[in-house]
Protein backbone atom coordinates (compact mmCIF):
# COMPACT_ATOMS: atom_id res chain seq x y z
CA UNK A 1 0.00 0.00 0.00
CA UNK A 2 2.82 2.42 0.86
CA UNK A 3 4.37 1.93 -2.57
CA UNK A 4 1.07 2.93 -4.22
CA UNK A 5 0.88 6.09 -2.11
CA UNK A 6 4.49 6.96 -2.94
CA UNK A 7 3.95 6.16 -6.61
CA UNK A 8 0.97 8.53 -6.65
CA UNK A 9 3.06 11.28 -5.08
CA UNK A 10 5.91 10.77 -7.54
CA UNK A 11 3.49 10.66 -10.48
CA UNK A 12 2.06 14.04 -9.46
CA UNK A 13 5.61 15.38 -9.06
CA UNK A 14 6.44 14.22 -12.58
CA UNK A 15 3.40 15.86 -14.19
CA UNK A 16 3.97 16.36 -17.90
CA UNK A 17 6.55 13.56 -18.11
CA UNK A 18 5.90 10.04 -19.41
CA UNK A 19 3.94 7.88 -16.99
CA UNK A 20 6.01 5.33 -15.07
CA UNK A 21 4.08 2.13 -14.45
CA UNK A 22 4.10 0.33 -11.11
CA UNK A 23 3.73 -3.44 -11.09
CA UNK A 24 3.14 -5.65 -8.07
CA UNK A 25 5.04 -8.93 -7.75
CA UNK A 26 3.09 -11.95 -6.53
CA UNK A 27 5.10 -14.26 -4.27
CA UNK A 28 4.17 -17.36 -2.29
CA UNK A 29 6.48 -20.13 -3.52
CA UNK A 30 4.62 -23.39 -4.20
CA UNK A 31 1.86 -22.70 -1.66
CA UNK A 32 -1.52 -22.24 -3.33
CA UNK A 33 -3.11 -20.39 -0.40
CA UNK A 34 -0.24 -17.88 -0.21
CA UNK A 35 -0.15 -17.30 -3.98
CA UNK A 36 -3.92 -16.81 -4.23
CA UNK A 37 -4.07 -14.52 -1.19
CA UNK A 38 -1.16 -12.40 -2.45
CA UNK A 39 -2.77 -12.13 -5.90
CA UNK A 40 -6.20 -11.14 -4.50
CA UNK A 41 -4.68 -8.61 -2.12
CA UNK A 42 -2.61 -6.93 -4.81
CA UNK A 43 -5.40 -6.99 -7.40
CA UNK A 44 -7.77 -5.23 -4.98
CA UNK A 45 -5.22 -2.81 -3.57
CA UNK A 46 -5.80 0.86 -4.27
CA UNK A 47 -4.49 4.01 -2.61
CA UNK A 48 -5.46 7.56 -3.56
CA UNK A 49 -6.84 6.33 -6.87
CA UNK A 50 -3.60 4.50 -7.64
CA UNK A 51 -3.51 0.79 -8.36
CA UNK A 52 -0.97 -1.57 -9.85
CA UNK A 53 -0.62 -1.33 -13.63
CA UNK A 54 0.29 -4.99 -13.97
CA UNK A 55 1.58 -7.95 -12.02
CA UNK A 56 4.73 -10.04 -11.99
CA UNK A 57 4.55 -13.67 -10.98
CA UNK A 58 7.84 -14.23 -9.19
CA UNK A 59 9.59 -16.46 -6.77
CA UNK A 60 11.02 -19.93 -6.97
CA UNK A 61 8.70 -21.65 -9.42
CA UNK A 62 9.38 -25.36 -9.56
CA UNK A 63 9.53 -26.33 -13.22
CA UNK A 64 7.08 -29.21 -12.93
CA UNK A 65 4.53 -26.96 -11.18
CA UNK A 66 5.07 -23.76 -13.16
CA UNK A 67 1.79 -23.92 -15.10
CA UNK A 68 -0.23 -24.79 -12.01
CA UNK A 69 1.25 -21.98 -9.92
CA UNK A 70 0.80 -19.39 -12.66
CA UNK A 71 -2.81 -20.49 -13.19
CA UNK A 72 -3.60 -20.00 -9.46
CA UNK A 73 -2.34 -16.44 -9.66
CA UNK A 74 -3.99 -15.61 -12.99
CA UNK A 75 -7.36 -16.93 -11.80
CA UNK A 76 -7.25 -14.39 -8.96
CA UNK A 77 -5.95 -11.45 -11.01
CA UNK A 78 -8.42 -11.37 -13.85
CA UNK A 79 -7.57 -10.10 -17.32
CA UNK A 80 -7.86 -6.32 -16.97
CA UNK A 81 -4.12 -5.87 -16.39
CA UNK A 82 -1.08 -7.72 -17.78
CA UNK A 83 0.49 -10.67 -15.98
CA UNK A 84 4.26 -11.02 -16.38
CA UNK A 85 6.08 -14.27 -15.63
CA UNK A 86 9.49 -13.52 -14.12
CA UNK A 87 12.57 -15.57 -14.88
CA UNK A 88 11.45 -18.58 -16.86
CA UNK A 89 14.23 -20.98 -17.74
CA UNK A 90 13.69 -23.02 -20.90
CA UNK A 91 11.76 -22.33 -24.11
CA UNK A 92 9.15 -24.98 -23.25
CA UNK A 93 8.30 -22.95 -20.13
CA UNK A 94 6.78 -20.34 -22.45
CA UNK A 95 4.07 -22.81 -23.44
CA UNK A 96 3.19 -23.59 -19.81
CA UNK A 97 3.14 -19.88 -18.94
CA UNK A 98 0.90 -18.91 -21.86
CA UNK A 99 -1.48 -21.81 -21.25
CA UNK A 100 -1.77 -20.72 -17.60
CA UNK A 101 -2.53 -17.08 -18.50
CA UNK A 102 0.79 -15.19 -18.47
CA UNK A 103 1.01 -12.36 -21.00
CA UNK A 104 4.71 -11.47 -21.01
CA UNK A 105 7.99 -13.04 -19.90
CA UNK A 106 11.61 -12.30 -19.12
CA UNK A 107 14.57 -14.57 -18.77
CA UNK A 108 18.36 -14.52 -18.78
CA UNK A 109 18.58 -18.19 -19.72
CA UNK A 110 19.09 -17.77 -23.49
CA UNK A 111 22.27 -15.80 -22.81
CA UNK A 112 23.30 -17.83 -19.75
CA UNK A 113 23.24 -21.15 -21.60
CA UNK A 114 24.82 -19.51 -24.66
CA UNK A 115 27.86 -18.57 -22.57
CA UNK A 116 28.21 -22.30 -21.92
CA UNK A 117 27.95 -23.21 -25.64
CA UNK A 118 24.30 -24.37 -25.59
CA UNK A 119 22.38 -23.65 -28.79
CA UNK A 120 18.56 -23.64 -28.91
CA UNK A 121 16.85 -25.57 -31.69
CA UNK A 122 13.25 -26.63 -32.38
CA UNK A 123 14.28 -30.12 -31.16
CA UNK A 124 15.90 -29.00 -27.91
CA UNK A 125 19.42 -27.71 -27.45
CA UNK A 126 22.89 -28.95 -28.26
CA UNK A 127 26.42 -28.10 -27.15
CA UNK A 128 28.37 -26.51 -30.01
CA UNK A 129 31.72 -27.56 -28.48
CA UNK A 130 31.07 -31.24 -29.28
CA UNK A 131 33.73 -32.59 -31.65
CA UNK A 132 31.17 -33.46 -34.33
CA UNK A 133 30.74 -29.72 -35.09
CA UNK A 134 34.45 -29.11 -35.78
CA UNK A 135 33.97 -29.53 -39.54
CA UNK A 136 30.24 -28.81 -39.82
CA UNK A 137 29.90 -25.90 -42.21
CA UNK A 138 26.13 -25.53 -41.88
CA UNK A 139 24.32 -22.82 -39.87
CA UNK A 140 23.63 -23.45 -36.19
CA UNK A 141 20.02 -24.17 -37.19
CA UNK A 142 19.09 -24.76 -40.80
CA UNK A 143 16.60 -22.13 -42.00
CA UNK A 144 17.17 -19.79 -39.03
CA UNK A 145 17.38 -16.16 -40.12
CA UNK A 146 19.31 -14.77 -37.15
CA UNK A 147 22.55 -12.88 -37.74
CA UNK A 148 24.64 -15.78 -36.46
CA UNK A 149 23.03 -18.40 -38.68
CA UNK A 150 23.12 -16.21 -41.78
CA UNK A 151 26.79 -15.24 -41.36
CA UNK A 152 28.58 -18.07 -39.52
CA UNK A 153 28.82 -21.85 -39.46
CA UNK A 154 28.72 -24.40 -36.68
CA UNK A 155 32.42 -25.07 -37.33
CA UNK A 156 33.34 -21.41 -36.85
CA UNK A 157 31.29 -20.98 -33.66
CA UNK A 158 32.76 -24.29 -32.41
CA UNK A 159 36.26 -22.91 -33.10
CA UNK A 160 35.48 -19.65 -31.26
CA UNK A 161 34.37 -21.52 -28.14
CA UNK A 162 37.41 -23.82 -28.24
CA UNK A 163 39.69 -20.77 -28.65
CA UNK A 164 37.86 -19.07 -25.75
CA UNK A 165 37.03 -16.06 -27.92
CA UNK A 166 34.42 -13.72 -26.39
CA UNK A 167 32.67 -13.57 -29.77
CA UNK A 168 31.61 -17.19 -29.24
CA UNK A 169 29.10 -16.42 -26.50
CA UNK A 170 27.94 -13.28 -28.31
CA UNK A 171 27.07 -15.23 -31.46
CA UNK A 172 25.41 -18.01 -29.45
CA UNK A 173 23.40 -15.42 -27.48
CA UNK A 174 22.25 -13.69 -30.66
CA UNK A 175 20.96 -17.01 -31.96
CA UNK A 176 19.28 -18.09 -28.69
CA UNK A 177 17.57 -14.71 -28.24
CA UNK A 178 16.37 -14.79 -31.86
CA UNK A 179 15.10 -18.34 -31.41
CA UNK A 180 13.18 -17.35 -28.27
CA UNK A 181 11.63 -14.29 -29.93
CA UNK A 182 10.54 -16.31 -32.97
CA UNK A 183 9.03 -18.92 -30.66
CA UNK A 184 6.98 -16.24 -28.89
CA UNK A 185 5.94 -14.86 -32.29
CA UNK A 186 4.73 -18.34 -33.29
CA UNK A 187 2.80 -18.73 -30.03
CA UNK A 188 1.21 -15.30 -30.51
CA UNK A 189 0.22 -16.14 -34.11
CA UNK A 190 -1.24 -19.46 -32.97
CA UNK A 191 -3.36 -17.71 -30.33
CA UNK A 192 -4.52 -15.13 -32.86
CA UNK A 193 -5.49 -17.87 -35.34
CA UNK A 194 -7.43 -19.71 -32.63
Region annotations inferred by a language model:
Residues 1-15, 131-134:
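Non-catalytic, usually N-terminal nucleic-acid engagement modules in DNA/RNA processing proteins
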Residues 1-9, 26, 99, 182, ...:
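Charged/polar positions on well-ordered alpha helices
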Residues 2-3, 21, 51, 179-181:
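Generic detector of bulky aromatic hydrophobic side chains
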Residues 3-6, 38, 69, 176, ...:
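Alpha-helical packing segments of well-folded alpha/beta enzyme cores
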Residues 9-19, 187-193:
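Surface-exposed helix-capping loop/turn segments at secondary-structure junctions
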Residues 12-22, 92-93, 142-156:
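Electropositive, surface-exposed helix/loop patches at the edges of structured domains
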Residues 17-140:
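Glycine-rich phosphate/ribose-binding loops and adjacent secondary-structure elements
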Residues 141-193:
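C-terminal extensions of enzymes
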Amino acid sequence: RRCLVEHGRLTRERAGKPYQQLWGVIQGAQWEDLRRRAARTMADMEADGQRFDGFGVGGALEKENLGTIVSWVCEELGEDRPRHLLGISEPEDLFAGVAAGADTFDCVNPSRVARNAAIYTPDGRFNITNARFKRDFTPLVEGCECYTCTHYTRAYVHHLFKAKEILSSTLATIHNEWFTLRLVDAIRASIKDG
